[in-house]
Amino acid sequence: MQCWQQPFLRFLQQPFFLATASLAGSSSSFNVLIPKRDEDGDGEGPGDVTAGVSRAAGSPSGWEAPWVQQPRCCRRATPVCCAGQGPPRSLQQGGSEVLLGQLCSPEPDWLPSSGPKVAKQVFQVAAELLQHPEHFVPSSVPEGCVHKPGSTCDGSLKGRAYPSCVPKRDPEHSREESHPLSG
């Protein structure tokens, strides 16, 4: 079970895009989750932000990203429903599935409001993931994870992770919280 911070739990309850990104000229690819936003106010998802993200995503650091809408959006406080294929896999160099929930709590400003900025940040972190997967929280983090120096929860992903993790929430409590969002 991942380590969670409260602001990140709230973030995970938003609808998401699933993006598949690959490093240009490389066989490495991975999936990332990007928050959907109702930018045009029509109540039907991100509106024009989709095109903005797609255009912006092609330039940072040579990343290519075809964007597809994930049919089942993340409306529970868990990344598993976003994956659509069971629990998140452990992080690995090639073809790994990267859920934002696997990061040990990014700073709030790591998830800016505009789509292109989100894309750029995600690709920067994805590049760091491919080079230094040990900086990220793997899917096998033990239950009730707490801060221990040198552990995967010590905030070694500088500037993007808090220095400590909180114990996981009570499953009953999480279910109650997510209920209003699941319908």
UniProtKB/Swiss-Prot annotation:
**Primary localisation category:** secreted
Q: Which GO terms describe its cellular component?
A: extracellular region
Q: Which UniProt keywords apply?
A: Secreted, Signal
Where does it reside? Secreted
Q: Which residues form the signal peptide?
A: 1-29
Q: Where is the composition biased (Basic and acidic residues)?
A: 167-183
Q: Where is this region: Disordered?
A: 149-183
**This protein is called what?**
Putative uncharacterized protein UNQ6494/PRO21346
